[in-house]
Amino acid sequence: MAAATMAISSSSFAGKAVNVPSSSQITGNGKATMRKTVTKAKPVSSGSPWYGPDRVKYLGPFSGEAPSYLTGEFPGDYGWDTAGLSADPETFAKNRELEVIHCRWAMLGALGCVFPELFARNGVKFGEAVWFKAGSQIFSEGGLDYLGNPSLVHAQSILAIWACQVVLMGAVEGYRVAGGPLGEVIDPLYPGGSFDPLGLADDPEAFAELKVKEIKNGRLAMFSMFGFFVQAIVTGKGPLENLADHLADPVNNNAWAFATNFVPGK
């Protein structure tokens, strides 16, 4: 009763009518049910250059204007959708979630590709520091030592690593989507709560700007990871070694030189 009274009083300030459920709707067959409610984020101020109809746009060479369904509501919306991939709202929501998740993985992956090699080049012993060779160490006779230290994690079974990854990532993803004992999730893409111990999302306008920075850096990281994959296939070297080779001899160590000389399988 108190909850219903609070709901009526709070909504009356917004000028909206409230339908108070009857006791039978609340209790059902003698069982109380709880539903996850989703609250809409506070609108970003019109002065932001990244949101709204007057936001920064990149329409590409084949688009005269931004399509009507791209209104600048979401971070990273530059009004460019020549192929119409965002026309269907459900497809757009799914693709947006996939992009944000892949952005986060790519940013972590790019750091994981660069930093071990950077540390190894500065005297830190990692064992195998090149990112696409490190995982294969688990099949060696001595197994895989995390950070080159057998007292941390000494892995010798690929199945055990796979099982740990499934359990740990499954638990985190389940909590991100459905909530858990540490709190209820309002937005699966930006769950906040225990996922935001520093309180970066407390200020709505600062949080909106951080979303834009995340998506921009994430898109750059996805391109970086694609480049790392291509480098690994073509040169068989890590990103920092490729960079050092290019700086030492830019004429013979560049994308054009490798593209014109590369023959798969040789």
From Swiss-Prot:
Chlorophyll a 1 binds at W80, S86, E99, R219. It is a multi-pass membrane protein. Chlorophyll a 3 binds at Q137, L147, E214. Chlorophyll b 4 binds at Q165, R176. The modification Phosphothreonine is found at T37. The keyword Transmembrane applies. Chlorophyll b 3 binds at S157, E173. The chain crosses the membrane at residues 100-120, 152-172, 220-240. The keyword Zinc-finger does not apply. GO terms for biological process: photosynthesis, light harvesting. Chlorophyll a 6 binds at H246, A255. Residues 24-46 are annotated as: Disordered. Chlorophyll b 1 binds at Y58. Gene3D superfamilies: Chlorophyll a/b binding protein domain. Keywords: Acetylation, Chlorophyll, Chloroplast, Chromophore, Magnesium, Membrane, Metal-binding, Phosphoprotein, Photosynthesis, Photosystem I, Photosystem II, Plastid, Thylakoid, Transit peptide, Transmembrane, Transmembrane helix. Binds at least 14 chlorophylls (8 Chl-a and 6 Chl-b) and carotenoids such as lutein and neoxanthin. Photoregulated by reversible phosphorylation of its threonine residues. Chlorophyll a 5 binds at K213, Q231. Its main location: plastid. One of its GO terms (cellular component) is chloroplast thylakoid membrane. The LHC complex consists of chlorophyll a-b binding proteins. There are at least 16 genes for the major CAB protein which can be classified into at least 5 small multigene families. Belongs to the light-harvesting chlorophyll a/b-binding (LHC) protein family. The light-harvesting complex (LHC) functions as a light receptor, it captures and delivers excitation energy to photosystems with which it is closely associated. This is Chlorophyll a-b binding protein 25, chloroplastic. The gene is CAB25.
